[in-house]
């Protein structure tokens, strides 16, 4: 299913219920390029103060970026990149939005910048927003924080069984998800302490690495003395 399938009406229902039933004011909204459409942006803008949506690039837009001269060098995520802002007036009629553009040099496997006959080859990333006051670095940093939240779901899905829920009803599955979420917090505490004494493990090691060192034990059945003996390869 296309990521935009019923996304606009789903967002509209969720935001309306949050604001009307809970009395919550939605301050900021951020989403990836799957939400980059006129209908979704109009719905979001009406229901929150500021939004930050990854803009889809196209060939003509990248060519426009190459013509820009006023780039500022900043550090984002411990890496240097160039940033600038341009006004986007032709996306929705009567509306003017800010397009925050980030460019990073394309590098080969040895870390060397790639070039062509026109100079350094850049990778461009854009964020569409109605925030005209924050700096480009602040906007990019805030948008990138959504990746940390997605990683939490990746860990829960692959390490703690959320991708294969054990029950047929949501009530039971909700209990399972809450318990495994608490177990994940306990595991993070455990791995932080164990990693200080067990060298192969790190504070960021996933559950699979922990199982490999502490739970999984290689073994082999061997024939000796006219009987089968289970040989454990462990200390």
Residue ranges and their predicted role:
Residues 29-37, 57-60:
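Acidic, metal-coordinating catalytic cores used for nucleic-acid/nucleotide bond scission
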Residues 37-43, 62-66:
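A short acidic (Asp/Glu
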Residues 50-158:
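An anionic, glycine-rich sequence signature occurring as long contiguous blocks
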Residues 136-170, 175, 179, 183-188:
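Short amphipathic alpha-helical "interface-anchor" segments enriched in bulky aromatics
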Residues 26-34, 51, 127, 149-156, ...:
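Short, conserved catalytic/metal-binding motifs centered on acidic residues
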Residues 186-235:
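A short, flexible helix-boundary coil/loop motif
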């Amino acid at each position: 299913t296309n990521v935009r399938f019923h996304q606009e009406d789903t967002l509209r229902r969720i935001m309306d219920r949050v604001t009307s039933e809970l009395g919550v004011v939605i301050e900021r909204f951020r989403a990836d390029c799957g939400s980059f459409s006129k209908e979704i942006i109009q719905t979001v803008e009406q229901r929150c103060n500021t939004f930050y949506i990854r803009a889809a690039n196209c060939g003509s837009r990248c060519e426009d970026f190459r013509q820009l001269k006023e780039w500022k060098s900043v550090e984002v995520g411990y890496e240097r990149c160039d940033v600038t802002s341009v006004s986007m007036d032709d996306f929705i009629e009567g509306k003017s939005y800010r397009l925050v553009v980030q460019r990073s040099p394309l590098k080969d496997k040895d870390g060397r910048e790639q070039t062509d006959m026109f100079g350094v080859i850049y990778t461009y990333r854009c964020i569409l927003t109605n925030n005209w006051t924050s700096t480009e670095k602040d906007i990019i940093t805030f948008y990138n924080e959504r990746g940390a939240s997605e990683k939490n779901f990746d860990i829960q899905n692959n390490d703690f069984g959320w991708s294969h829920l054990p029950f047929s009803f949501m009530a039971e599955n909700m209990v399972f998800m809450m318990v495994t979420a608490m177990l994940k917090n306990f595991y993070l505490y455990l791995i932080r302490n164990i990693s200080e004494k067990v060298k192969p493990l790190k504070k960021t090691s996933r559950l699979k690495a922990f199982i490999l060192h502490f739970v999984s034990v290689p073994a082999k059945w061997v024939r000796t003395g006219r009987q089968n003996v289970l040989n454990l390869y462990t200390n």
